[in-house]
Curated annotation (Swiss-Prot):
It catalyses: isochorismate + 2-oxoglutarate + H(+) = 5-enolpyruvoyl-6-hydroxy-2-succinyl-cyclohex-3-ene-1-carboxylate + CO2. It holds the Pfam family TPP_enzyme_N. One of its GO terms (molecular function) is 2-succinyl-5-enolpyruvyl-6-hydroxy-3-cyclohexene-1-carboxylic-acid synthase activity. The gene is menD. This is 2-succinyl-5-enolpyruvyl-6-hydroxy-3-cyclohexene-1-carboxylate synthase. It comes from Bacillus anthracis.
Length: 584
């Protein structure tokens, strides 16, 4: 028995210690029995920060939020059985949004599998193709070879999670009883250290000089170009992309999640209203770029994606460090396996300065005309969902974070988050674009990003109410703006809206809940606003005071649809008139 406890303590102690040496210092733990030894060791290790979350589905997204904000791996620990299955949605999102999660699941030992033992199920490759790597850890043994194995396996798994494209990995730990480690053992954290501990160094892909010279030569003869920056771009992409734009004269179509629309950098070349003006048929038929250079994931804007797909005669250069490029439009003609920064740096160094021509001025002019028209909605007294975004940005302080939920909030952010000299970070879950786990992801991000404002619809808010517990347990500061249109507002913009007979029951799905009681239960403040002045006051109060603050603004789905369509129609008229004037 003592040999078992000694082996358990030293073996798992080496694993936990190696995590901290590899800078995995945050773990979200869901309570359970079989995971006891790992949980206790993590709690005891001075280099590890532990966060409790009792709901595994919310816990998975909470860890995802921390990892997104810190831009480094975060561990996630649960017991055996369906607890591990509840991590699945967060693992899927982490995989597709390229976020490194270290998923740790405790398991029954092999003799208790497939024999009807309680809380035992097949956890081998549980997450299938949604993790970059899976390993079934060996049972604890008291030997230097096994301590060495524990550390080296940890190194391999962390390296896999961090190698482009980043993503989740899964380690499954079979453990026998008894489960309580012995903390009186000498040198508990030192086993397997020293000569056995290695460090995985990851280099950057280098741009071949021959290709750079060739590309510079070609681009020098292509006056009509576009730089498209989507989600998952490098954190320093703004400075490099704007320099490249200045050299080439190509406008930057900046997705809000690229974080190029706001900040202290020069935004002369940044186009922010393309989602609206690329709906114009005359513009789409007459504006034909020679080359499109794309960084990061595909943009939120459907109009931009459709525009990209129509450019069948253009050169499409997709830059992706991993080589697993994202191209749902199926138009890529060249894929460059390099980091955004390496690509931009190589071109900036050798690219001659190309004068800003009529091509850039056309985009800039239409963008300004579109923005002028869209800003008219700031005079609307009605609770228009687009204005929710502009009014939040108006009161957000320097360095704040705006987290946009999926469905309508991220689309309104795309349409109405205009360029700003304030440094405002925009975040969202755009891996698989689900509405689950949004509250938890935002709360995880708020551990690092303060102040943070989450904009979320009422259905998405309902979907992750359990996530609010983290705000109470960990005393987090967050302001949540709930846009309550009593249902799935996005479906009003889709063809399903025309099927009136079944629309409300299948798509509108009103739930008629009063969220004030729930927010109060979790120790937060709740305010239901009436008017834009009160809305701005409540949001500002939220970002300047501690704790959980929920601000609810009620909108009407049909009225919101009409306002969007009216604004779009007016904008299209302005654009068409402007284009026809230019052609004369």
């Amino acid at each position: 028995m003592n040999n078992h406890i000694e082996a358990l303590s030293y073996y798992l102690g080496a694993f936990v210690d190696e995590l901290t040496l590899l800078n995995v210092c945050d773990v979200v733990i869901s309570p359970g029995s079989r995971s006891t030894p790992i949980a206790l060791l993590m709690e005891q290790h001075e280099g590890m920060n532990t966060y409790l979350h009792v709901d595994e589905r919310s816990a998975g997204f909470f860890a995802l939020g921390i990892a997104k904000a810190k831009k480094r791996p975060v561990a996630l620990l649960c017991t055996s059985g369906t607890a591990a299955a509840n991590y699945y949605p967060a693992v899927c999102e982490a995989f597709h949004s390229r976020v490194p999660l270290i998923v740790l699941t405790a398991d029954r030992p092999h003799e208790l599998r497939d024999v009807g033992a309680p809380q035992a199920m097949n956890q081998i490759n549980l997450y299938g193709t949604f993790v970059k790597q899976f390993t079934e850890m060996a049972l604890p043994e008291a030997s230097e070879a096994m301590y060495h194995y524990a550390r080296l396996t940890t190194q391999r798994m962390i390296a896999s999670a961090c190698l482009a494209p980043q993503g989740p990995v899964h380690l499954n730990f079979p453990v026998r009883e008894p489960l309580i480690p012995d903390f009186s053992l000498e040198s508990l954290w030192d086993k397997g250290r020293g000569e056995y501990t290695g460090v995985v160094q990851q280099g950057n892909a280098v741009m071949p000089s021959e290709y750079v010279d060739s590309l510079v030569g070609r681009l020098s003869h292509m006056e009509k170009g576009l730089i498209i920056c989507g989600d998952d771009s490098h954190s320093e992409i703004a400075a490099f992309a704007t320099q490249l734009a200045e050299k080439t004269g190509y406008p930057i179509l900046a997705d809000p999640l690229s974080n190029i629309r706001s900040g202290h950098h020069d935004k002369t070349m940044v186009i922010d209203c393309y989602d609206t003006f690329l709906r114009n048929e005359l513009l789409k038929e007459t504006w034909k770029p020679d080359v499109l250079i794309r960084f990061g994931g595909m943009p939120v804007s459907k109009a931009l994606t459709q525009f990209i797909k129509k450019q069948t005669k253009a050169v499409h250069i997709v830059v992706d460090e991993s080589g697993q490029w994202r191209d749902p439009a199926l138009v890529a003609t060249e894929v460059v396996q390099a980091s955004d920064i390496a690509f931009c740096s190589a071109l900036i160094e050798k690219m001659p300065v190309m004068k800003k021509n009529d091509w850039f001025r056309m985009w800039q002019h239409i963008n300004e005309k579109t923005k002028e028209t869209l800003r008219e909605m700031e005079t609307y007294d009605t609770a228009f969902e687009g204005r929710v975004i502009t009014d939040i940005v108006r009161v957000l302080p320097e360095g704040a974070t705006l987290f946009a939920s999926n469905s309508m909030p991220i689309r309104d952010t795309d349409s109405f988050f205009f360029t700003s000299d304030k440094n405002i970070q925009v975040m969202a879950n755009r891996g698989v674009n689900g509405i689950d786990g949004i509250i938890s992801t935002a709360l995880g991000a708020s551990m690092i990003c303060d102040p943070l404002v989450l904009v979320i619809g009422d259905l998405s808010f309902y979907h992750d109410l359990n996530g609010l517990l983290a705000a109470k347990l960990h005393e987090l500061n967050i302001t949540i703006v709930v846009v309550n249109n009593d249902g799935g507002g996005i479906f009003s913009f889709l063809p399903q809206y025309e099927k009136k007979e079944h629309f409300e029951s299948l798509f509108g799905t009103p739930i008629g809940l009063d969220y004030e009681h729930v927010v109060t239960m979790y120790g937060g403040s709740f305010s239901r606003v009436n008017g834009w002045e009160q809305f701005r006051e409540e949001v500002q109060k939220g970002v300047t005071t501690e704790g959980l603050h929920v601000v609810e603004i009620c909108t009407n789905r049909d009225e919101n649809l009409t306002l969007h369509r009216t604004l779009w129609a007016k904008t299209q008229d302005v654009i068409t008139t402007s284009l026809q004037g230019e052609s004369k």
